[in-house]
Amino acid sequence: RRLKDWRPSGSMEPFRNLRRMYNDAGVKIYAWKQLSTSMSDEEFEYVFNVAEALGCTHTTLELPTDAAQLKRIGDFAAKKKIYAAYHTHTQGNMTAFDQAFALSPGNKANVDFGHYVAAGNVGGSPMQFLEKHHARIASFHLKDRTTPEHCALNLPWGTGETPIKPILQLVSRNKWAIPASIELEYAVPEGSDAVKEVRKCVEYCRTALTA
């Protein structure tokens, strides 16, 4: 309750300082996640003000199923000129975002292509999803998962069934300005660590984009 009361009066200066620190290190913060359908309009204002202070183009949240909330959030995002980008796990498919897109221009997708594959590529492949929806994708997540037929596993990059290289190449070839996040969700091998594994993922992306 105290946090709910504090948010509307919270200072943006710490977030501006955080943005400067990251920018000075060559890192752009393009999104942050705090939005919730249970928030008041005053809390929405706070979330979008933080997004602006951080330099974000969008704020993310799990995809709601309630049409009224999708419209409320999307219209608020459109007013603030910072998109609401909805994230999916294994409920992601070719039509999962259709309702959100139709209800407000402020609604976009933060699609996870690893989870999309783990859900079974319902309605089309990740590349087909990109071809159809690229203008409404604010950002996407990458991990290498297998299909349900192969236990929907999280595996080291290049050993699963998520078409990471074709996804990156399609985005690059079409010059779609869509940022992507590397998500390290497979088990870190013995003798390695998370930093080493993320470096491997970064190199995998570089190889894809220079092929």
Regions found by a protein language model. Name each.
Residues 15-17, 21-111, 116-120:
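Active-site acidic/histidine proton-transfer and metal-coordination neighborhood
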Residues 10, 14, 43, 65, ...:
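Soluble or luminal CAZymes and related metallo-dependent hydrolases
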Residues 5, 34, 190:
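Second-shell loop/turn segments in exported
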Residues 79, 96-211:
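Histidine-acidic metal/acid-base catalytic patches
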